[in-house]
Amino acid sequence: MTDAEETLLVGYRYDGHGDMVQTTDARGVSKHFEYGKGHLLTRLTNQGGMAFHWEYEGEGENARCVHTWGDGGVMEYFFEYAQGVTRTRNGEGAVSEYHYDSDRLIYKVVDANGGITRKQYNAYKELEVTVDPEGNCRKTEYNRYGLPSVITDANGNTTLLTYDGDCNLTRMKTPGGRVLAWDYDTMGRLTARTGPDGQKTRYGYEGKLLRTITDGQGRTYRLTFDDRYNLTLMEYPNGLFRRWSYDRRGRLAEEVDVKGNATRYGYDEADNLIRLEEPDGNTHRFEYDAMGNMVHAQDGIREVRFTYGALGVLKSREQERHRITFGYNSELQLKRIGNEAGEDYRFELDGLGQVTAETGFDGIRREYERDGAGNVVRVARPGGKWTRYEYDGEGNILRELQYDGEESLYTYDKDGLLVKAGNGECLTELVRDRKTGRVTEERQGGHSVRSEYDKEGNRTRVTSTLGADIRHAYDRDGYLQSMQAGEGWKASWMRDSAGLEMQRTCSGGITVRTERDRFGRETRKSVRSGSIERGAWKYEWGMADRLLSKENELTGTVMRYDYDRFDFLIRQETTKGSATDVIYRVPDFVGNLYGTPERKDRKYGAGGRLLEDAECIYHYDDEGNLVFREFRQPREDAVRHDRRRMEREYGIRRPVTDMGWIYEWTSGGMLRRVVRPDGRSVEFRYDALGRRTAKQYLGKVTRWVWDGNTPLHEWVAAVTDNDGREEASCPDGNSLTTWIFEEGTFVPAAKIRGDRQCSIVSDYMGTPVQMYDSEGNRIWDCTLDIYGKVTDFRGESLHDCPFRFQGQYEDVETGLYYNRFRYYDAEIGCYLNQDPIGLTRRLSVYGYVCNSNLLLDIVGWHGNSLDNIADSRLYEIKINGILFKYGIATEKYVTKIDITVVSPNGTSHIIPKGTPTRIKNQLRKAYANYDDVTFDSQPYKQISTFKMREIESKKIKAYVELTQKVPSGNVDHARRGYGVLADDFSGVHDLIKDLKMKNNLHISNDIH
C-alpha cells in the first residue's frame, strides 16, 4: 500500500485533559467516552448507542469502582470493600466473596451458591494448592524458574514436566506413564514434537519463516510466503498445492483448493466480509450493524436476518418469516429460546449461571441438583423418576443409578481414559496400549476384539475370539488401500491425488468405479461383475451440494429432488417409463414433516410430537417417549391390548381401538420392549455404552459383539428359559455372521457367514445398494426413498443386509431402524423419542436430518455431518507452558486479514490471514488475556470430520492430565454429548460415560 493509498482504520479524539473521548472506525462509526474527576471513566457509549456506566468511591489513586452497569441494568455489579475481603453482587442478586491476605493473594473464594474454594501459595506467591467446594485438591510444584514441574490431580495422580535452560517445555510424563517431548532451536522455535507413540513431527525454518513440516513417516509439507509474510502456497507431500492471494491491505482475496476450485472474498472498509463467491457459482452477501454484528446474509438460495441485544448477544434469527428468538437475564445468560411456533424452552439458573431446571417446548420439566464443583448429582424427572450420579475428583462419572435400581459403573486409568463400563447386561473392558492409550483389546462378556496399529496409529488388524481376522493396509498418504478377512474376502482401493475413491476391486471379480466432478462429488458409479455391468447410477448436482437427480442407468429409473429455502429435502419424483410417483416430505415452521404439500395429513403437538396421521394416533409418556402407536381403525390381524393395563403402566387415556404397537422404555431412555399388534413381544438389551447386545423374539435371541461403534459379529440362538438364556454361549461357524466396515467409517463393506462371502456396494452417502457373492452374482439390490424407506428390492431376503442410512440397522420384527441411541421410523420420518443431546444440534428433538441426500445421523443425535470431507487442522494452544486447548478446524473458513492482538504486558501478537476461523477465535482470546501463549497446528488433507474428531479425542486423552482436569479450553465441549473426550475406540466424538447422563440431562447446562 502506497502513501497515496493510505486508508484510515481507526481515528482517535482527545479532550483538553488528555482523555480519549472518541474513537471512529473506517466506516465512520464512533464510540464515545466520558470522564469524571481524576480521569475516571464514567460512561462509555458504544457504536450501537448503548451506554455503560461506572460509579466510584474515593478520589485519585484511592478511587475504587463501587457500581457498574449497562443501560437497562445489563451486566450490573456492586462492589463492597473491607479489610481482607471484597464482595460482589450482580444484577441477579448473586453474591460472591474474595478473601485476600497481606500480599493481596486470594486465599478463599465464597461463590454465589455458598461453596468455598481455598488456595494456598508458596513463598514465591505461586499457587500450590487449590481445594474446591467438594474438597477435591489439586497441587502444583514449581521449578526454580517458577514453571510447573509436578502436578497432582484430585485423584492423587501425578504429571511430571521438564524444561530446558530457556524454560521451554521439553518433556511431559502423564500419570499413566505416557511421554510427550518437544525440541527447540537456539531461537526457541519448536523444531520437533514427539508423541507418546514415538512418532516425531519436525519443523524446518528459513530465516524467520516456517518452511517445512515433516511427519513421522517422512511426508513433508512445504510452505511459501510473499514479501509481506502472507502464506501463498502449501505443497502437500503428494505434490498437490493450495494457493492463497491477498488484496493490497493483506486480506485474503482468493483461495484455490487442491482441485483448482477458487473461492473469492470481498470486504467493506472495516474489514467485514461482505461478499463470498463459491466455486460452484453461489455468491454470498453479508451486511453488518454498527457493532460489526452480521444482520443480513443472503446467497442464491437463502436469506436470513439477525437482531442483537447488549454486547452482541443474538436476540432473533428470521428466515422466510420463520423466527427464532432468544431471551437473557441481566448477566446475558440464556434463559429462553422461542421457536417458530411461538413455543418457549426455558432455563432456570443458580447464582453461578448453572442450569438448575429446564422446561421444554412441550412443557416437560427437569430439575438438576449439583454438588459444589458443579457436577450434576441428581436429575429429577417427570413422574417422580430420578437419576443419580457419582464422580471421582476429576469429574469422571463413576456410577449412574436410576430410580428403578438400574445401574451403570465406570472405571478409568490414571490418565482418565475409560477402561471399564458395566451394567446388569454386560461388562465391557478396554485394554489400552501403555504408550499411546489406544484400545488394543475390548472384552465384552465372554468375547473379545483385539486391535493392532501401525506407527501412525492406523489400525492394521482386527481379530476376535469368534474367529474374525481382518487386515488393513494403507498407502503412502495414509489412506485405506486394502482390506482382507482371513484367507477369503478381499478388497482394494485406487484413489485420486486428493485421496478420494475412484475404483474398488472386491472378491468375486467385482469392480466398482466412481467418477467425480471438480468438487469431488460423485457423478457416476458403476459396478461390474467380470465384464458385465451389474449396476450404474448417475448423479446431477446443483449449488450448495444439492443433489438434483439420480438415475439408475440399468433400469431407467430417474429420481428428481426438490428443496426449500431452508435446505429441507421436500420432494422426490420417481419416473420409470411412463409411470411417475411423487413422495413429499414437507416441513412446517418448526420442521415437523408432512406427506402432502398442503400439510394437512398429520397433526403435531408442542415440541414436535407427532399426534395423528391418516393411519394412527400416537401416545407418549411423561418424558416424551412414544408408548403407543394406535391404529385408527380395527384390524383383523391385530389383538386388543388391555386398556386398564395401558392406562396403569403407560398413562394412555381414551384409546380408540386398543390396537397397535406398544413401546416400553428403560429408565435410562433406551427402547426395552416392543409389543407388536399381534401381541408378540420383541425385547432389547444394551451394554453400558448404549450398544445393543441382544434382541429376543419368538424363542430366539440375536446377539451382537461390537467393534467400537459398529457391529462385528451377529448370530441367532435358541432361548432356553424365561431369562433369555441361550442354548450355547458361542455360535458355530455356519450361524455366525461377521460384518466388515470400511475402516474408520460406518459404511458396510462385506458380510461373511460360514463359507459365504459377500461384498456390499454403497452409494455416495454410504447407504448399501447392492450385494454380491464370491462368484460375482448380484444377490441383493435395494433402493430407499427420501425417508429411508425401501421402495424397490430384488433378492432373497431384505434382511440379508439390514443396514439402511449410515448407522441404521433395520429390525424386521418391528420395522424400526436401530440408530445406536434411538430408533428411527422410516414410515413417518422421525424418531420415537427425543434427542438425548437435546437442543445441541437443532430445535426439533424428534426429527431426522433436513436433507437425507447430504446429511447423516449416525448415532441418533440429530444432524451429524461427520462424513464431510475437507482440509482440516488439529491445533493446540498452550498458556504459560500448560496445555489450554486441543481443537480441530476446517480450512474452509479462514481469516481474511492479519489480526493484531495486544497481550496484557503490551506485546503485539499477529494472527496471520489465512488462519482457520475457529483457530483465530481461540488465539484472539488467549493473546488478549495472557502474556505467554504458544500455538501449533498440524494439517490433514481431505479428511472427514469424523476422523478429525477421533484424532482430536486421542490427543486430548494423551494430554488430559496436564492440568489435572479437562484442559480449560475443552471444558465446554466435554460437557456436550458429542464432547471431545471420546473413547478413541468408539470413533465418535462422544464421552459415553457422560452420555448416559445426557440421556436425561439434555445438556442444557451447555446451551447458555
Predicted region positions:
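Structural recognition of the beta-strand scaffold that forms the well-ordered cores
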Residues: I760, Q770, R804, G847, ...
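Extended charged/polar low-complexity repeat regions
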Residues: M1-K603, G608-D613, I617-Y620, G624-A638, ...
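Cysteine-centered, disulfide-bonded loop motifs in secreted/extracellular proteins
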Residues: G624-L626, R692, G766-P768, L784, ...
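A motif-centric feature for acidic-aromatic and gly/ser/thr-rich catalytic loops and repeats
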Residues: F589, R599-G605, A750-R820, N853-L855
